[in-house]
From Swiss-Prot:
Gene3D superfamilies linked: 3.30.2460.20
Name of the protein described by the UniProt record: Protein Wnt-10a
GO cellular component: extracellular space
GO molecular function, one term: cytokine activity
Lineage top rank: taxon: Eukaryota
Disulfide bonds: C85-C100
Organism, scientific name: Plethodon jordani (Red-cheeked salamander)
Keyword Glycoprotein included in the entry's annotation: yes
The keyword Iron is assigned to this record: no
Residues where lipid is bound covalently (O-palmitoleoyl serine): S1
Localization (cell): Secreted, Extracellular space, Extracellular matrix; Secreted
Main location: secreted
Length: 119
């Protein structure tokens, strides 16, 4: 009949939020790996009460991240103490996040400006 049928398949990247949520979930479930002296890269299960094998989709890490809330000069981290936060911001500059749950002081300022007012 002369007609031809063509099928095309392709993969589509999921929405960015879906990828971010999956990475966040895996981040919080990541496994600390302590290499043996033999440097085989195998898991050291001595600190884990129940042994579990990591899956191919699991995230693993070799050392804990520094605490960026506290000052650590050897890492050139000044910490967050003394920084200005935004009480109403939903972002990373909000007071709860930036002050690491330590509380914060509220500074109220009334700006004064010179004007050519006559009384």
């Amino acid at each position: 009949s002369g007609s031809c049928q063509l099928k095309t398949c392709w993969q589509v990247t999921p929405e960015f939020r879906v990828v971010g949520n999956l990475l966040k979930e895996r981040f919080y479930g990541a496994t600390l790996i302590k290499p043996h002296n033999r440097n085989t890269g195998q898991l050291d299960h001595s600190h884990i009460p129940h042994r579990r094998r990591t899956s191919i989709n699991s995230l693993v890490y070799f050392e804990k991240s520094p605490d960026f809330c506290e000052r650590e000069p050897q890492l050139d981290s000044t910490g967050t103490q003394g920084r200005i936060c935004n009480k109403t911001s939903p972002g990373m500059d909000n007071c709860e996040s930036l002050c690491c749950g330590r509380g914060h002081n509220i500074l109220r300022q009334t700006p004064s400006e010179r004007c050519n007012c006559k009384f």
